[in-house]
Amino acid sequence: LDDWLSNEDTKNLISRERPRNSYSYFYCFNFDPQFDAEYEPDNWRKAVNNENFRKALSSALNKTKEVAVLEPNVPEDYVIQTITPAKFTYNADGTDFTEIGDMAALGDTFNEAKAVEYRDLAKSELAAEGVTFPVKVLLPYNPTEVNWDKECQVVEQQMESLLGTDFIDIIVQTGPTDGFLTEIRRNGKYAMLKCNWGADYADPETWTDPFYQAKGENGYD
């Protein structure tokens, strides 16, 4: 480490944390809500366990429009469609990992027609289970992160406009300035939340850690 720090060619490569471009961002659904009763956690629990409900929300999210809050010029360059981001690893032929096999066919998950189709299926299924509408979707953000509040506003307006305010009620909530990760995500005080993950090593598998767990593990923390 001392050699790197003393070398003009390498000293700027040392950082106390990962560079910001070494993170992926994605939304998580909370299947074990611990938020206040006013946001109807039991109702949310029933709704989020319905596959068509989850597909409706996923298909209704226009990621490009959200990313445009942060990068208005070329937002599509920052939208990822795979768990492993593009331009991270390549095979021996120089082909991007995300363009190999079935991943090459993956496209934008935003699909208005599919979102409405899933919504209608979810409505009838959830109504039979006693779910009340609109389903409250608690969406907190960290006020110390620049423009995260604006991202949430765009998500709220865009998704409610497509799915209808009679189906979902996205509630944007300001989280704490200190200890956001522990207070909100780790304590389950959200319905839907923008989360992130960083690469630990130079292999595509490093990005999959939040999405599976071994027996006895508590999952993404």
Predicted segment positions?
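Acidic-aromatic pocket-rim loops
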Residues: 19-23, 28-36, 174, 178-221
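Structural recognition of the beta-strand scaffold that forms the well-ordered cores
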Residues: 16, 25-30, 56-60, 67-68, ...
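Extracytoplasmic/peripheral linker and loop segments enriched in polar/acidic and small residues
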Residues: 46-55, 59, 63, 67-70, ...
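Secondary-structure transition/capping motifs at alpha-helix termini
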Residues: 7-14, 126-129, 160-167
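Append "and occasionally in soluble cytosolic enzymes with long acidic Gly/Pro-rich linkers
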Residues: 47-161
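Extracellular/periplasmic solute-recognition and catalytic clefts
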Residues: 1-36, 68-70
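Periplasmic solute-binding protein
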Residues: 18-45, 58, 85-97
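Short helices/loops that flank or line small-molecule/ion binding pockets
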Residues: 1-8, 52, 153-161, 178-191
